[in-house]
Amino acid sequence: MDHVLQFFQQLDNLVWGAPLLVLLVGTGIYLTLRLGLLQIRYLPKAFRLIFTEDEGHGDISSFGALATALAATVGTGNIVGVATAIQTGGPGALFWMWMAAFFGMATKYAEGLLAIRYRTKDDNGHISGGPMYYILHGMGEKWRPLAIFFAVAGVLVALFGIGTMTQVNSITGFLQASFGTAPEVASVVIALVVSTIIFGGIHWISKVSEKVVPFMAAAYIFATITIIALHLDQLLPALKAVFSGAFTGTAAMGGFAGATVKMAIQKGVARGVFSNESGLGSAPIAAAAAKTNEPVEQGLISMTGTFIDTIIICSLTGLSLLVSGEWMARGSTSTLTQDTFTGVFGPVGGIILTLCLVLFATTTILGWSYYGERCFEFLFGVKHINLYRTFFVFMVGLGGFLKLDLVWVIADIVNGLMALPNLIALLALSPVIIKESKQYFKK
């Protein structure tokens, strides 16, 4: 197994090497500059739009689309993923997560805009959209192979990456540590719960997301703010460690082995993308289903997802780890945040975190089931959707039986493969994005 893990780690380093990181962040920087720092100027308007009355064609409300996207993004990456980034990349990794998120907001805006601009209807009358459609309809038929590549990668991510294995693996690990629940039992129960919802399609998924996502996010935010408040004297040193570690690296201390600037950048950006999915091309699949006729407005709503996910939730996770000192402890990344919670709240803290993670991960599974389904439909049509759903549930049930380190590495690899065609499309269609934006904001 060690040789297998080493092979995938080398492949991961290749996929997430300098070229993809430069393309990922560079696309966000380019769009940020061309759109005139849109993520700063129009963020308040974006939040107001979330709660406006929906007008236009679509399957679900704009809030439902955002909730579904947040359901998919707010997952184990916000808890275990942040801990992994800090333990391997040092406190400086948090800074690079922020940078990836800031520029990623412009990327997410562009994705949401194009999703509405180039969406279509399938044979069942449901809305279909996302990168595979704006590649095909925006860039032309000759780019169909790139659209197919994205769709294949999307199915792989849903079935073998973010959508199933990483989420279930983390859930079972936390349930076993907190309640002694056997991973086999937990995996089967999760699979059964997921199956009762995803066979109802996007309407069921969005309804569940609208109810669960605000509650789980608020509960987790309150808990992490409490931890930081109880260690307020350590907040300033923690922030200093974040900024110094981002540019000079972090020396070894306690159980922490040390990290270079390169490690901080690589782990911070990779985990940031895993968490908020900006540039990955997943969120526009949900955005396409929104009831709106205005691409720019849905783009603005979409970019709030990155702000909520990384700038708020991931930051609170990272700072709670740093102020408590748990990030320097020896042990697995899956228990770092749990130790932080139990250190403040006692045994109840472990239960609180476990319940938050179960909700985070379960809603992520639901959101990604829809993403993978739309990609699968693009490849094979609507007739075989139930075959995909059945196999998805099977993979959910399998997730608790695999080694965590290997699962995360595989997830990173397929994430990178999914991001590449989407980023190419965003750059190629940037004139459309800029033109649509200028026309809207002139009104």
Language model features: what each stretch is:
Residues G56-T88, L114-G138, F149-V152, L156, ...:
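Alpha-helical membrane segments and immediately flanking helix-loop junctions
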Residues L23-Y30, R34-F47, V168-L175, A182-F243, ...:
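Membrane-interface loop-to-helix entry segments
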Residues L37-S62, T84-L94, W98, A106-K142, ...:
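Flexible loop linkers connecting adjacent transmembrane helices
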Residues T27, L31-T32, A100-G125, M132, ...:
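Helix-loop-helix module between adjacent transmembrane segments
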Residues M1-T76, I86-A93, G104, G397, ...:
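N-terminal alpha-helical transmembrane segments of multi-pass membrane transport
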Residues H3, L20, L35-L38, G77-V82, ...:
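Transmembrane helix-loop junctions in multi-pass membrane proteins
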Residues T32, E111-R119, D123, I225-A241, ...:
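Extracellular/periplasmic helix-exit of transmembrane alpha-helices
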